[in-house]
């Protein structure tokens, strides 16, 4: 019986390490894909309409908040790709608490960027969809449905990215804490 306990305690950290690495790789790949998809949807969102001979167009570049979200996702996607490469190097070199702490700081910074981009884009998207009767801002999404749907999909994918980065931040923090203890 003591032999089985020793065998379990030796294999458990290896299984835990493999699970941690698998989770990290999976969520980093999903974060990269979500960043690319969200940026692409936002950058390509535009619509031109003709209302009584007046041509109006809506583009992401007309809104600083939408530009911020698009470029935030580009930056986060690039840095997430670099962190994936860094993770592969960390796995090959072995467990060093400092490496996991750097991953934690990276994930926290990327998560903070995405939170800012999502908050800004959600605010302006809400105004576009519902308007604000107190200030006289009219809703535009009833006229620019295609543009608003693409922007809304982009923001939704950014929130998915935020969830992935939150999971990465929590797992990296947990791993760096366990390594130090």
Curated annotation (Swiss-Prot):
Signal peptide: none annotated. Residues 1-18, 92-100, 174-181 are cytoplasmic. One of its GO terms (cellular component) is plasma membrane. Pfam families: CASP_dom. Residues 40-70, 122-152 are extracellular. The chain crosses the membrane at residues 19-39, 71-91, 101-121, 153-173. Keywords: Cell membrane, Membrane, Transmembrane, Transmembrane helix. It comes from the Eukaryota. Belongs to the Casparian strip membrane proteins (CASP) family. PANTHER family: CASP-LIKE PROTEIN 1U1. Homodimer and heterodimers. This is CASP-like protein 1F1.
């Amino acid at each position: 019986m003591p032999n089985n306990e020793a065998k379990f305690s030796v294999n458990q950290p290896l299984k835990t390490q493999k699970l941690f690495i698998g989770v990290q790789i999976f969520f980093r790949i999903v974060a990269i894909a979500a960043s690319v998809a969200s940026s692409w949807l936002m950058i390509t969102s535009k619509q031109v309409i003709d209302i009584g001979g007046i041509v109006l167009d809506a583009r992401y570049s007309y809104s600083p908040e939408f530009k911020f979200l698009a470029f935030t996702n580009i930056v986060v996607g690039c840095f997430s790709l670099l962190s994936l490469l860094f993770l592969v190097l960390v796995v090959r070199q072995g467990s060093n608490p400092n490496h996991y702490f750097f991953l934690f700081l990276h994930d926290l910074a990327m998560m903070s960027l995405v939170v800012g981009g999502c908050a800004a884009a959600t605010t302006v998207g809400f105004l576009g969809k519902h308007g604000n009767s107190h200030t006289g801002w009219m809703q535009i999404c009833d006229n620019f449905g295609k543009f608003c749907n693409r922007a809304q999909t982009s923001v939704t994918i950014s929130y998915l990215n935020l969830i992935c980065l939150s999971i990465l931040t929590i797992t990296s923090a947990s791993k760096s804490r366990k390594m130090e203890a």
